[in-house]
Curated annotation (Swiss-Prot):
Disulfide bonds: none annotated. The keyword Lyase applies. Keywords: Decarboxylase, Lyase, Pyrimidine biosynthesis. GO terms for biological process: 'de novo' pyrimidine nucleobase biosynthetic process; 'de novo' UMP biosynthetic process. The active site is at K99. This is Orotidine 5'-phosphate decarboxylase. Belongs to the OMP decarboxylase family. Type 2 subfamily. GO terms for molecular function: orotidine-5'-phosphate decarboxylase activity. The keyword Lyase applies. It catalyses: orotidine 5'-phosphate + H(+) = UMP + CO2. Its EC number is 4.1.1.23. Pfam families: OMPdecase. It comes from the Bacteria. The lineage of its organism: Bacteria, Bacillati, Bacillota, Clostridia, Eubacteriales.
């Protein structure tokens, strides 16, 4: 059976490692475009649609951060739903950045909420720091359907060192132990590509840690945030990749707000986003 991770691996082979983050704040939408819409739902969705139309042939996937949509209530969630549906319509892969983290029946309900029904998506992000019993309820969807997870391992925020870097009695850091347990569980959902449908979220803001993480977790496909606005660059991101694959590199504001770099960029903001994607591809070594 071909798993969702095999699809993502092939998308990277065909289109490169760029993941567009649709973390769409209302303030990101150009005023000349925003004034065409009477309600928030349409404004956000139509902005996203323009970005998707301009980039879907050049990106591996899209990451949709649900908080930006939840903040606008039901209209925002409708824009979220329509965005996921449109990503599917154009034949692309969606990662819903929801960072769920709970156990037992609650985790089962989270799985149902995001892998079925109105908010159905391909991958979701999860927080495993409550323990592996916060991951196991998702396994039936990974084993029986084309769904996947990206679990937080070593994040890109400065505060990650508050907990993730704490050393155990054996001298190993907490994030290393988490990554090891995730990779072990991931052996139950290995794709034909050699990677598991349980991926890891690893920030591209520290070069040396990145080299060790890639070396230690050879079967884990990475979602790599921190590029651009958070200070990470191609050098830091590339250490997580293996033969040009094995990860997708996310940029959100850098792509959504690319139009601000250009004179009269608001008029063709979607084309500016495409230029930024192609620039990012080149930086990551994809010509």
């Amino acid at each position: 059976m071909v798993l969702i991770i095999d699809r993502l691996y092939e998308e990277v082979n065909k289109k490169g490692n760029v993941c567009v983050g649709l973390d769409t704040d209302l303030s990101y939408i150009p005023q000349r475009f925003l004034k065409n819409y009477e309600n928030i739902e349409d404004a956000i969705f139509q902005f996203n649609r323009k970005i998707i139309d301009a980039t879907h042939d050049a990106v591996a996937c899209y990451k949709v951060q649900i908080a930006y949509y939840e903040s606008f209530g039901l209209k925002g969630l409708m824009a979220y739903k329509r965005t996921l549906e449109y990503i599917k319509k154009v034949g692309c892969i969606a990662i819903s950045d929801v960072k769920r983290g709970d156990i037992s029946k609650t985790a089962e309900m989270y799985a149902k909420a995001h892998f079925e029904g109105d908010f159905e998506t391909d991958f979701i992000t999860v927080n495993p720091y409550m323990g592996m019993d916060s991951i196991e309820p998702y396994m039936p969807y990974l084993q029986n359907k084309e769904k996947g997870l990206f679990a937080l391992v070593r994040t890109s925020n400065p505060g990650s060192k508050d907990f993730e870097y704490i050393q155990s009695g054996s001298g190993r850091r907490v994030y290393e132990i988490v990554g090891e347990k995730l990779e072990r569980l991931g052996e139950k959902v290995m794709g034909q590509c050699g990677y598991s449908s349980i991926g890891g979220v690893v920030g591209c803001t520290t070069l040396e840690d990145g080299k060790e993480i890639r070396k230690n977790f050879g079967k884990t496909f990475f979602l790599i945030p921190g590029f651009g606005a958070q200070g990470g660059g191609a050098k830091e991101a590339n250490v997580y990749l293996k033969d040009g694959n094995g990860g997708v590199v996310n940029s959100s504001r850098g792509i959504l707000l690319a139009y601000k770099k250009y004179e009269n960029g608001e008029k063709n903001f979607d084309e500016c986003s495409r230029k930024e994607v192609l620039k990012m591809q080149k930086e990551l070594g994809r010509e």
